Amino acid sequence: MNKAKKPCCGEEPEETSPQKTAAEIKQEIKVRYDEFAKEGGSAEGCCPLVGGSAESFALEHGLYSQEDMALIPKLAINLSRGCGNPTSFANIQPGQVVADFGSGGGIDLVLAAHKVGPTGKVIGVDFAPHMSERAKQVMAEAGLSDRAEFILLDIENPQVPDNIADVVISNCVINLCPCKPCVYKQIYEILKPGGHLAISDIVTRGEVDPKVREYFQSIWAGCTGGAIPEDGYLKIVQDAGFSQLKVVARHTLNLKELDEMASCPGKKFSPTFSKEKLAQMQGKIVSAKFLAVKPKE
Ligand SMILES: C[S@@+](CC[C@H](N)C(=O)[O-])C[C@H]1O[C@@H](n2cnc3c(N)ncnc32)[C@H](O)[C@@H]1O
């Protein structure tokens, strides 16, 4: 690891909600997901996994195929809090090294590990210790521990190792991070030249009343409080040095999906918005899936 690397936005990223510092937001998020992991997740009331169980949502929305679902231990399904399936469009090849930023309970680690095969490796990066332990448990249950490594680290942190990954995936995580440029800097660093990213994340689209946006940010709840406009988000990706940026899919959340996304990982763990406030964001919260490449030097 390169210990001499500097943070991209200072020790304490500036962009925060109007009422909380970046450090406070991250601590709240870490505790929230750790508590959720301690309980082993839940098959109900998940953020993007709207209506009923995580499994039914995934199948219903084609996020994960039936073949995918058959490979995933129940624990990983219950801990799953994604908004897409980056392994389905990441073009992962046998023998590659895949890093999952904010790997959570390991659902995408399992699928990526099957794709890289016995000569490849997957690396789960997450800052919540109990979540990371659950992902280890999941990989063991799936019989894939020999091709999995874990790094317990903030993905905004410059201690993330350099030039080791062919592919970086991330599923519904970067919206939670106060300093998105910091995360994309670390994704750039961990990728080998010519490597690529495949991301599923939550963004906003269309006009959002600034007061409504400020209100959402002040609570920083679920996977909507930190969501930023898609065009600004994609500019951050390009400014980090990535090329060949391509949005491969978008899904606009309906009110029910929005309600569950806004209280991710579940109403017991996260602050919630009133139905009235959520209605003001309806049609404007989108799950976007995109690819980009780190140019060869
Ligand atoms: C919404 S869950 C998604 C988990 C997983 N990707 C999935 O699809 O189920 C967000 C995950 O990102 C992790 N996370 C959030 N912010 C992080 C940060 N700054 N550094 C590392 N992990 C982070 C949380 O601990 C949690 O496990």
Descriptions of predicted regions:
Residues D166-C179:
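A short SAM/SAH-binding and catalytic strip from SAM-dependent methyltransferases
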Residues V50-V97, D108-L111, K115:
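Conserved alpha-helix/loop element of class I SAM-dependent methyltransferases that forms part
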Residues N2-A58:
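N-terminal auxiliary segments of SAM/dcSAM-dependent transferases
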